[in-house]
């Protein structure tokens, strides 16, 4: 009996003296649990942010919106980068008011330029370079689908083929400049169809379009030279003259075409050619839905003639009821 009592006393004594160690271990376990939860939450935030980013660049706007809103609500509230991405999404979804709301909450580099553009887009004559470059970055991966149509008209091919029809007397080793070379849609057709031999130079403001060109055209070198720069900056700095200048929807960031036609004219050799494709409309104006200017064909022709170009052909191509383009080929006679 006495032995049993001693055992019980010893048991409780050991239990009591171990309580501090027990409490300490429990605290450590709880701290580890909290740290683990923090890591997982941080990881979830990063994962959802990256998924949102991927969806945004693939054009899956609703999925991108969901991911960034999850990050904003549950993980990183009031995050400047998240607000900026939400602003971009609403811009692409044509909700300019909501885009402005989120951009105003951000502190990113082009915030002020973007907000000013969104509030005054009805009055602009040119899309700011920073916005145009970012927009083309965002649409780069699905850019070819913009020209999809039920008529199976391959617009880049149509543009190159129409240009080639009206070009003659090319010198050996002639030079071609493409303004707004995108992911290489037109450059690829030029390499396939234009007679050898020539050098092809591309100018594209979107760094991402230049970067993913190799993804679309693997093992194919399209351009001899490519410049990641705004078109007007290139034309002002350029000292070379080209036999042919092409622009496939590369000038739709501006309605001040006279300015650009004048710069282009000075960069073309005598008897050289200028071919362009532009989105068409009854009235020249900025399209909030398309994020670019759309042009009246007669006005464009008049601007070309005022800049001393001789128009060889000027046609409207109808892909769909509200998706029309003009293809114009002209020549510098003097």
UniProtKB/Swiss-Prot annotation:
Gene3D superfamilies: Tetratricopeptide repeat domain, Vaccinia Virus protein VP39
A Pfam family reported for this protein in Swiss-Prot or TrEMBL: Methyltransf_23
Protein name: Uncharacterized protein RP092
UniProt source species: Rickettsia prowazekii (strain Madrid E)
Lineage: Bacteria, Pseudomonadati, Pseudomonadota, Alphaproteobacteria, Rickettsiales
């Amino acid at each position: 009996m006495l032995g049993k009592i001693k055992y019980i006393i010893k048991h409780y004594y050991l239990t009591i003296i171990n309580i501090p160690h027990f409490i300490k271990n429990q605290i450590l376990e709880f701290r580890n649990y909290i740290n683990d939860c923090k890591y997982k939450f941080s990881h979830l935030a990063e994962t959802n942010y990256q998924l949102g980013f991927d969806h945004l660049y693939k054009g899956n706007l609703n999925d991108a919106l969901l991911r960034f809103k999850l990050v904003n609500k549950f993980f990183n509230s009031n995050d400047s980068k998240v607000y900026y991405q939400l602003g971009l999404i609403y811009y692409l979804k044509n909700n300019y008011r909501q885009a402005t709301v989120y951009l105003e909450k951000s502190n990113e580099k082009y915030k002020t330029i973007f907000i000013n553009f969104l509030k005054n887009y009805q009055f602009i004559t040119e899309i700011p370079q920073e916005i145009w470059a970012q927009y083309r970055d965002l649409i780069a991966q699905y850019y070819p689908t913009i020209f999809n149509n039920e008529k199976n008209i391959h617009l880049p091919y149509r543009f190159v083929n129409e240009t080639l029809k009206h070009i003659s007397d090319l010198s050996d080793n002639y030079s071609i400049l493409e303004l707004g070379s995108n992911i290489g849609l037109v450059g690829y057709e030029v390499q396939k169809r234009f007679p050898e031999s020539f050098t092809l130079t591309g100018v594209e403001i979107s760094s991402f379009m230049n970067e993913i060109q190799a993804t679309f055209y693997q093992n194919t070198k399209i351009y001899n030279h490519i410049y990641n720069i705004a078109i007007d900056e290139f034309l002002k700095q350029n000292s070379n003259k080209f036999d042919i200048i092409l622009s496939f929807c590369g000038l739709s960031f501006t309605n001040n075409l006279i300015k650009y036609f004048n710069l282009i004219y000075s960069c073309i050799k005598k008897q050289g050619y200028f071919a362009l494709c532009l989105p068409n409309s009854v009235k020249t104006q900025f399209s909030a839905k398309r994020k670019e200017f759309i042009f009246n064909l007669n006005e464009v022709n008049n601007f070309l003639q005022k800049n001393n170009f001789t128009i060889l052909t000027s046609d409207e191509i109808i892909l769909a009821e509200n998706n029309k383009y003009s293809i114009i080929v002209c020549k510098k006679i003097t």
